[in-house]
Amino acid sequence: MKRLFFIIGILVIGCSDFNPITSEDCDCGLEISSTLPYVNGSYELEYNQNLAQTYTMLDAATECGWSQHLQWDTNYQYRINTDWVSLINPASMTDEDGNAHVVFAAWEEFIGETVKVYCGYMDDHGHHFLDSLKIEVVDNE
């Protein structure tokens, strides 16, 4: 729940006009995507029944160069014993081209669910960026 408030906070702050730096000073951005099939506004992750989890890689493009720290989260978590586990790694760093990658993994219990993935960061000028996408976990085989 704390993560969700954090992400909403990034969105609210990122959309406000209180930052004195003009938008011309900022060449950065954020777009997250996947190579999964895109159907009706969501990416489709085909669950593999032969694995405990089915994995895919998500991509982020910032156009902001090396060493931007991106934070990731989802609107779902999975409980293992007493611990809540995210469906996505919580952080990644951009390469020299401003690109980053992160692993998303779903358990069988998520078949039929549409998971919303959030990614955000703040650039060197104090601008906040946030993007999201949806992944539907399906079992069509």
Question: What are the functions of these language-model segments?
Answer:
Residues D131-V138:
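C-terminal edge beta-strand
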Residues N40-Y55, A61:
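Solvent-exposed, conformationally flexible loop/turn segments
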Residues L4-I13:
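Sec-dependent N-terminal signal peptides
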Residues A106-I111:
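Short, surface-exposed loop/turn segments at beta-strand-coil junctions that are enriched for proline
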Residues V12-V39:
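Bacterial Sec-dependent N-terminal signal peptides
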